[in-house]
Amino acid sequence: MQHVRTSGPGDEVAALDVAGVSHSYGPKRALDDVSFSIAPGTFTVLLGLNGAGKTTLFSLISHLYDTRRGSIRIFGHDVSRASGEALRRVGIVFQARTLDLDLSVHQNLSYHASLHGIGGHEARQRIAALLDTVNMQGRQHDKARSLSGGQIRRIEIARALLHRPSLLLLDEATVGLDIQSRAGILATIRKLVETEGIGVLWATHLIDEVEDGDHVVVLRQGDLVAKGKVADVVMATSANSIRDAFSKLNRIGPADMAEISS
């Protein structure tokens, strides 16, 4: 494995620390001894082909599945032992769309706020501010079903930020979106990292999105095969670009690369 630290220098507590994590579905191995960490205020891209283990890892981090081998800590809290404390610091955007399409934008967001004990004036203030953050101001009364795919994604990001998490997880957040929508969402996340100091783990199979990250973690069929700064991973694999490095790490040819490059 090509290895460069993903966390920053010093003894700062990692926003996310994944240590020796393995997971199987019956006889099928989904993850095998995966370890990496993310420093607060950094943007890490989790890159892998479909079936690499990205969604399984997200399910373990969010405690949808129990971590039976290895450990996952969020700001020092083990998610399997103190899940409530750990997960209160996390915002999650899953690949599947999860807005209630029969409700308005405001109703979707206010319901989520209520789950975190946020209501009344404070909820309205946070919703208004976040709609501005994701460039959806003035759309609070629109029905969710009237929104485009990119707009729904923006609302889901706003929802994930309502309780002011310190770590944001996004699983294939731009799948099915046009290039302009993808670029806009990535720019929004990049700005959150820089202005709010949020740690981000962005899972994708699209190589073009790697350049937006500070670091990259590469999964291949459940194995972690590279991690570090993008330039360092490229250098360690004797590649000319991250696209070339990914091709080498996954042992795939030009025809397959075309599918994951746009």
What are these regions (language model features)?
Residues 70-81, 86:
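Conserved ABC transporter NBD signature motif
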Residues 110, 114, 121-139:
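Conserved ABC ATPase "signature" region
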Residues 143-147:
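Conserved ABC ATPase signature
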Residues 164:
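Conserved catalytic motifs of ABC-family nucleotide-binding domains
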Residues 168-171:
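Catalytic Walker B motif of ABC-type/P-loop ATPase nucleotide-binding domains
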Residues 183-195:
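Helical segment within the ABC ATPase nucleotide-binding domain
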